[in-house]
């Protein structure tokens, strides 16, 4: 089995981002956008079914060398970069969510791995 470097970086980034999403449920991430939101986790979980399916399906498509996999790879990596900036913006504003060493480590790891994933995706496409 000859798996590309992109496959492994995508897999690593996906595991990190999925762990971030687990952490997001703990911190009730939806309240970062709307602090007055009194809803519970149900809506948050529902939107994660298609999101996690797309992330995992994208890995299969990358393994098969399909263009859709490369598109999903770029979207997943962009999501990692967005998560990094979104959460550190809120941390700098004094929010308590994600303010522990493991939550921060997960976010910090997403940034360089996502940049590397974008670079590998583009290099594989050209």
Show the residue positions of the predicted features.
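Cytosolic, membrane-interface loops and tails of multi-pass inner-membrane proteins
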Residues: 22-40
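Core segments of transmembrane alpha-helices
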Residues: 44-60, 109-115
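Interfacial segments of alpha-helical transmembrane regions
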Residues: 2-13, 68-76
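Membrane-helix boundary connector in multi-pass membrane proteins
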Residues: 63-66, 70, 84-103, 125
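N-terminal signal-anchor/start-transfer transmembrane helix
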Residues: 9-27
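Membrane-helix exit/interface motif
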Residues: 29-30, 53-62, 86-90
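Hydrophobic alpha-helical membrane segments
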Residues: 48, 70-89, 107-114
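Juxtamembrane boundary at the C-terminal end of a transmembrane helix
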Residues: 116-126
